[in-house]
Amino acid sequence: MLRPNKIHQRTVREIIENSICRIFRWPYLWAANIFMALGLFNLRRNVEYCLSAMPDNLEYIPDTFVSVLVISEDHRSLIHFGVDPVAIARAIVSTIFLCKQGGSTIEQQFVRITLADHEQTFNRKLREQLTATLLSRRANRCAIAKAYLEKAYYGTNFNGLHALERSYGKNLCDMSLDEIVEITARLKYPQPLRESTILRAKFQRRCGWIKMRLGRLPVVADGVVRQLGTAA
């Protein structure tokens, strides 16, 4: 149970983060629309391609998968606009201090794997951010998260959720919360062909961290998905 001062600190932090996302929302939208109107970065084509890559039927993926994904990979998903300026700032600071840390949202990760664009350049990153911004305005955020989960790489011979269903020998709707946590943790630490003791320990720590986050935010099970369904 969180102490009152911890709750207050979290509330203040959330207010600040919400304000930062609101401040950056419109500049990103303006830039994305201007770039698209000028035909730069092939934004229109990229957005349409990403939309067409989203399957029509994603109901077979339980909402719990999305909830765990949001908590572990993109906990500000309810307040950002497809790009998380807070995470970007944190990633820049971490890079300066030689501690690499990701700042990509679920929308950005979906754009990246859909377009198969992994160039380590500023232009690629900007193109990805602008595409994610426009995509989040066109598509249901929960559907984007499920489409990402369906296409994501989870390790050797584990491309997409259907491969995981075969591996676990059960449907997604029959999987336990512990199994969903393990699957989500594989997004950061994909299953290698041969797993070393060090990699196994990192994977287990990741699972423990996700479970801790779920324990601290018990309302995630339904609330996150319900709100994501209407976010734009």
Give residue spans per PLM region.
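Juxtamembrane regions of bacterial inner-membrane/periplasmic proteins
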Residues: 1-232
